[in-house]
Design a protein with these regions (language model features):
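Charged DNA-binding/catalytic regions of mobile-element recombinases
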Residues: 1-284
Length: 284
């Protein structure tokens, strides 16, 4: 919207340049001719200082609205009306900007992205969600060895916190050994300080994928598709306890029976056994 002041300036300019009469210019711009006779008075020195102070405070405190800025002015002894402060801020383009999206906290990777070339070199973990027959939530932590595609653990519960994540990892390490790296997204359970400190203490390097890039954790994403297609979508769980039993049975089937195309159609356990005979497993 063009202000009256800007319209008056436009009228004066076209009249001075002889482009048209004042009457015609006012009619075209929707401005009364009497208003063109108006000449703004120069602001007194005290007002100029107040304006400068409003601008200075508004820039120093960009998240403050005009009410808070006025409160600061009154505290300093200035006489400033609410509408005056609001108008000056608007004219100077000093309104409070909308909040941008909050930056999500991310985990700190301690190793470069690594492609597994042997057992226990890279493990990955992630969560998958489902529901029981009565609508209660199920949360599953899955843990796998990226080289053999073995599913090392699936922990099932209604809720899983950082402590549960560490318990599941410790159980898998007791059975299999310590991995060199572990890959995950930036979920709160994986970037929790408790988890990062424990992994550092165990000498396990962390690899956090970029936010919104699940393909960087492609092995476990592919496994989740298999888990959902072959198990979760085929079953109706009446309780968490039943879900634990059924999902654990499927995990055993996947490791011992499921022929994997990337493993030459060996099942994950067969592949792990064959490569373990050729080289020692790190961490055992």
């Amino acid at each position: 919207m063009v202000s009256a002041s800007a319209k008056r300036q436009a009228v004066r300019r076209v009249v001075e340049e002889g482009l048209c009469s004042e009457r015609r210019a006012c009619r075209y711009l929707g401005l009364r001719r009497s208003s063109c006779q108006y000449r703004s008075q120069e602001a007194p020195e005290a007002t100029k200082k107040l304006v400068k102070r409003i601008v200075w405070l508004s820039r120093k405190y960009p998240r403050y609205g005009y009410r808070r800025i006025r409160a600061l002015l009154l505290r300093e002894g200035w006489k400033a009306g609410r509408k005056f402060v609001q108008r000056i801020r608007r004219q100077e383009g000093l309104g409070v900007k909308g909040r941008g999206p909050r930056r999500r906290r991310r985990g700190h990777s301690t190793a470069l992205p690594t492609r597994a070339t042997r057992l226990n070199e890279v493990w990955s973990w992630d969560f998958v969600h489902d529901r029981t027959d009565n609508g209660s939530s199920l949360k599953m932590l899955t843990l796998m060895d990226e080289y053999s595609r073995q599913c090392l653990k699936i922990r099932v519960s209604r809720k899983l916190k950082a402590k549960d994540v560490l318990d599941a990892l410790a159980e898998a390490m007791a059975e299999r050994g310590v991995p060199a790296h572990i890959r995950s997204d930036n979920g709160p359970e994986f970037i929790a300080r408790e988890v990062q400190d424990w992994l550092e203490e165990m000498g396990i390097c962390t690899i956090y994928i970029e936010p919104g890039s699940p393909w960087q954790n492609g092995h476990i994403e592919s496994f989740h598709n298999r888990l959902r297609d072959e198990c979760l979508n085929q079953e109706l769980f009446l309780s968490v306890a039943e879900a634990r039993v059924v999902i654990e049975e499927w995990r055993g089937f996947y490791n011992r029976v499921h022929p994997h195309s990337r493993l030459g159609f060996l099942n994950p356990d067969e592949f792990a056994t064959s490569v373990a005979q050729l080289e020692p497993v790190p961490g055992t």
